[in-house]
Curated annotation (Swiss-Prot):
Organism: Felis catus
Compositional bias annotation for Polar residues: 391-418
Protein name: Beta-2 adrenergic receptor
Lipidation (S-palmitoyl cysteine): 265, 341
Positions glycosylated per UniProt: 6, 15
Similarity comment: family membership: Belongs to the G-protein coupled receptor 1 family. Adrenergic receptor subfamily. ADRB2 sub-subfamily.
Gene: ADRB2
Length: 418
């Protein structure tokens, strides 16, 4: 977000930065600018590199092109725009102690900032709803939320985010009326974000607090359902091991199906944990800023500007965290290694999206229609329908199977955040 407009102090600047005629002070100021410039450049590099890697991996490997990962792509796009169009200009504003890009770009830059944060949390909210349906209505899920429907949802998220961010700022509904704010609006080198109280509170509620409440509520429900499913798995495992060995030998496929069902559900729960970490990290990074944002307009001089800007940058840094969190997923981890040439590439055999061996074993070897979850008639099915319900021999362009197999990740689900 833009800088608050109460004072002209800059983030962590040395005390004597306004006395450049003193040699010692000038040297300290130069050292501060260089040091902060390096740190901010590394932040920008991490945001851009990490999210380009995520988007490229999902675009290149069809194995990663699941409905949930479509939403992850949207989240990565928001983070990438943050790294390209927001953070560098924010860094320039701090390091140069003035705005050098004019009034139009000041408001446009601020609008993009609000857009990225709003799109991110609304996407996380959609992911929470997506996981809720995936784990509570597994057999309806694939028809309920197809890839085409996911694209429409993503488009709607960005349209709503764009309207709530650009419209109030470009129409000047956000502007305060006191003299200091009016002077700043008229000055080409001032980009302090003076806002009226109504806009600050309303935008914080619409762009952050409301989606946050929905996200927390839905995800808490998801974890409750997941916990019940884990308990069912434990009980079912106990019954399975208590069966007569001769009965298991008579129907070995049943035992294999049961183990696959349990493994599938456990992987689904690991995916939930990964998404929970993403949502939790976003909340921890941005919640302090939005609390201060409300307090600042209610009590103007209560929060030092340095604290406001520092918390704003903590939120910016969140855009670099998500690619690291995705590394919890073996599929993402292997895809990243392939793209970075950190492991032997098998992409040549899959260059056209197909294996050159139509009989080659996939990660879902042995999976057939009529998924194993259907065999557990005495327990409620709460996990997503396993990939055995599709003709998986015809899946195209996956992350190379020999790469997956070499890591011992056979039997992974069709949700790549595992």
């Amino acid at each position: 977000m833009g800088q608050p407009g109460n004072r002209s102090v800059f983030l962590l600047a040395p005390n004597g930065s306004h006395a450049p005629d003193q040699d010692g002070t000038q040297e300290r100021n130069d050292a501060w600018v260089v040091g902060m410039g390096i740190v901010m450049s590394l932040i920008v590099l991490a945001i851009v590199f990490g999210n380009v890697l995520v988007i490229t991996a999902i675009a290149r490997f069809e194995r990663l092109q699941t409905v949930t990962n479509y939403f992850i792509t949207s989240l990565a796009c928001a983070d990438l725009v943050m790294g390209l169009a927001v953070v560098p200009f924010g860094a320039s504003h701090i390091l140069m102690k003035m705005w050098t890009f004019g009034n139009f770009w000041c408001e446009f830059w601020t609008s993009i900032d609000v857009l990225c944060v709003t799109a991110s949390i609304e996407t996380l909210c959609v992911i929470a709803v997506d996981r809720y349906f995936a784990i509570t209505s597994p057999f309806k899920y694939q028809s309920l939320l197809t890839k085409n429907k996911a694209r429409v949802v993503i488009l709607m998220v960005w349209i709503v985010s764009g309207l709530t961010s650009f419209l109030p700022i470009q129409m000047h509904w956000y502007r305060a009326t006191h003299q200091e704010a009016i002077n700043c609006y008229a000055k080409e080198t001032c980009c302090d974000f003076f806002t009226n109280q109504a806009y600050a509170i309303a935008s914080s509620i619409v762009s952050f607090y409301l989606p946050l409440v929905v996200m927390v509520f839905v995800y808490s429900r998801v974890f409750q359902v997941a916990q019940r499913q884990l308990q069912k798995i434990d009980k079912s495992e106990g019954r399975f091991h208590a069966q007569n060995l001769s009965q298991v030998e008579q129907d070995g496929r049943s035992g294999h199906g049961h183990r696959r069902a349990s493994k599938f559900c456990l992987k689904e729960h690991k995916a939930l944990k990964t998404l929970g970490i993403i949502m939790g990290t976003f909340t921890l990074c941005w919640l302090p800023f939005f609390i201060v944002n409300i307090v600042h307009v209610i009590q103007d001089n209560l929060i030092p500007k340095e604290v406001y800007i520092l918390l704003n940058w903590v939120g910016y840094v969140n855009s670099a965290f998500n690619p690291l969190i995705y590394c919890r997923s073996p599929d993402f981890r292997i895809a990243f290694q392939e793209l970075l040439c950190l492991r032997r590439s098998s992409l040549k055999a899959y260059g056209n999206g197909y294996s050159n061996n139509s009989n080659s074993r996939t990660d879902y070897a042995g999976e057939h229609s009529g998924g194993p979850l259907g065999q557990e008639k005495d327990s409620e099915v709460l996990c997503e329908d396993p990939p055995g319900t599709e003709n998986l021999a015809n899946r195209q362009g996956t992350v190379p199977n020999d790469s997956i197999d070499s890591q011992g990740q056979n039997g992974s689900t069709n949700d790549s955040l595992l």
